[in-house]
């Protein structure tokens, strides 16, 4: 499988802690409902799953934000719940309600029946990865992704999204043996799923631990981080083009556990807006010439509802909080990939995103010229 050579490798260089001319950026959920063109494609597809399972539509919506904004990476258009769906839990999206499963995993029999799914059931995802990579034609790198074992388990046990995580936490505290079994299956499934995305052409992969932050200290380490480690240990290190494939881990609410996360086997840690990039850099960013992790994040997505002048101010505050970027192209050092602290809201005005992108690229260039 061969693809066009990469023209803009700024994002991948930053993942590898190599100096870049400016701070690269992409946005979580950058292909989505805030774009009128996305809504038009979704209407054609008839439903969210109709969109996600159709290679042509998934390719179209992945590229839509890149047609509007000079972003530095594309991310596969899909959903984290495709893996439990392939396990036979029956995923559906009711209009305005969010995801739900026809079958939840709550007792011994449910857990005993769980297995790593046949990856052929997810062929539509891998076909989309290859199609998107071809359509990008080397413009920017393509990121593949999955939910974390813990985050998938939250949906699998609850049967849908939750405000209090009562059912999944009840199972965790009362039958930790069952919880560990679910998480072990999930970890092996996520690793196989991400490896198949890498084989299909993904140039970086990201694990979204969206609900890791709801766990108590101690439980996070045992029930979330431990199984994220299990995923990372199984991931392929080389992509189809012979290049290394950076691994990104994002735990929403995980900034308090950076000491625990600094030694996990990934290249990039994502942070939400509650973390301070400079403090995170001191813990995990490393020194010039030494080991460390790149950081990704972490502006509050709600900043995008403010007027453009305030967006620029907040962008500068985030870039300043990371500190002086490393500029020595002969070695590695602390690097930053600009992103939101969570997914973009569907109500965001697209012109505000344009202001954000322009501010990130412009101000981060000027920081390197001081």
UniProtKB/Swiss-Prot annotation:
Enzyme class at the top of the EC tree: lyase
Subunit structure: Homodimer.
Family: Belongs to the uroporphyrinogen decarboxylase family.
Organism this protein belongs to: Acidovorax ebreus (strain TPSY) (Diaphorobacter sp. (strain TPSY))
Classification lineage: Bacteria, Pseudomonadati, Pseudomonadota, Betaproteobacteria, Burkholderiales
Function: Catalyzes the decarboxylation of four acetate groups of uroporphyrinogen-III to yield coproporphyrinogen-III.
Residue numbers binding substrate: 29-33, 79, 155, 210, 342
Disulfide bonds: none
One example of a Gene Ontology biological process annotation: protoporphyrinogen IX biosynthetic process from glutamate
Main location: cytoplasm
Keywords: Cytoplasm, Decarboxylase, Lyase, Porphyrin biosynthesis
A molecular function GO annotation: uroporphyrinogen decarboxylase activity
Pathway, per record: Porphyrin-containing compound metabolism; protoporphyrin-IX biosynthesis; coproporphyrinogen-III from 5-aminolevulinate: step 4/4
UniProt site (Transition state stabilizer): 79
EC number(s) recorded for this UniProt protein: 4.1.1.37
Reactions listed under catalytic activity: uroporphyrinogen III + 4 H(+) = coproporphyrinogen III + 4 CO2
Designated name of the protein: Uroporphyrinogen decarboxylase
Pfam family of the protein (one): URO-D
Single GO cellular component term: cytosol
CDD domains in UniProt: URO-D
InterPro entries with a match to the protein in the record: UROD/MetE-like_sf, Uroporphyrinogen_deCO2ase_HemE, Uroporphyrinogen_deCOase
Protein localization: Cytoplasm
